[in-house]
Design a protein with these regions (language model features):
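Hydrophobic, well-ordered beta-alpha structural blocks that scaffold small-molecule cofactor pockets
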Residues: 73, 77-210
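Acidic donor-binding loop at a coil-to-helix junction in glycosyltransferase catalytic cores
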Residues: 11-18
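Short active-site alpha-helical segment characteristic of glycosyltransferases
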Residues: 18-21, 28
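Short clusters of hydrophobic/aromatic residues that line enzyme substrate/ligand-binding pockets
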Residues: 6, 10, 46-48, 159
Length: 210
């Protein structure tokens, strides 16, 4: 099988597009447990100087190969959820594509836009702190799975367990504030507790960056 050359239509993400064509033809790409190539990011690298263009190209490429990507990530819901959040932020996803994501990870139906109302931050870590700095007095308290954090203060706000949060919560929105690769597991945790609506910190921070 002939894969062909780099596709100049995908300038900025041509490596990714080439790998996906390889996977389309041969199924998988195996790894070699050696460092054969190092990729450096610096202030004048393409990834930094043309970030917006790279994101646009990346999403064009993802849309072209979306069925392959969904198939490969079907058993990796954390990665698939992160991909969904990134794509949803940068482009208007077609309704039929949203349904494809929902069929694999139905919990994403619970993601809603932050409503500029009182909130609870689920995740008393770096991203939680960043989110609190943006929302300030709108944040009532934090929630975390780490028992060692319960009862302590973060930004002068208490850190509670999930059980305590459920007892004290009124109509506050819950904001999941963890790395994008862990959002899905937090969503599942809330879903099982009967909380079916939540916001994602990444979307809030992206909004306030504008």
């Amino acid at each position: 099988d002939e894969i062909g050359l780099y596709n100049t239509d995908f300038f900025g993400v041509e490596d990714y597009e080439y790998w996906l064509r390889i996977m389309t033809h041969f199924g998988d790409i195996l790894s070699v447990d050696q460092t054969l190539y190092q990729y450096r990011r610096h202030s004048v690298s393409l990834s930094e100087t043309r970030r917006k263009m790279v994101h646009q190209q990346l999403n064009r490429m993802r849309l072209q190969f979306i069925d392959l990507i969904l198939d490969k990530l079907r058993d990796k819901p954390n990665e698939l959820c992160g991909l969904y959040i990134e794509m949803k932020h940068t482009i208007a996803l077609p309704s039929e594509l949203i349904k494809k994501f929902e069929q694999i990870i139905p919990e994403i139906r619970g993601i809603e836009c932050y409503r500029d109302e009182p909130a609870i931050i689920f995740g008393a870590g770096t991203l939680g702190i960043q989110t609190e700095k943006v929302l300030k007095e709108k944040v009532h308290f934090f929630v975390d799975n780490d028992k060692e954090k319960w009862g302590h203060l973060l930004a002068n706000k208490g850190i509670l367990s999930l059980d305590e949060m459920l007892r004290r919560r009124k109509s506050d929105q819950i904001i999941i504030a963890v790395g994008i690769d862990r959002v899905y597991e937090m969503m599942v945790q809330l879903w099982r507790l009967g909380v079916h609506k939540f916001s994602v910190a990444q979307e809030i921070l992206w909004l306030y960056e504008k």
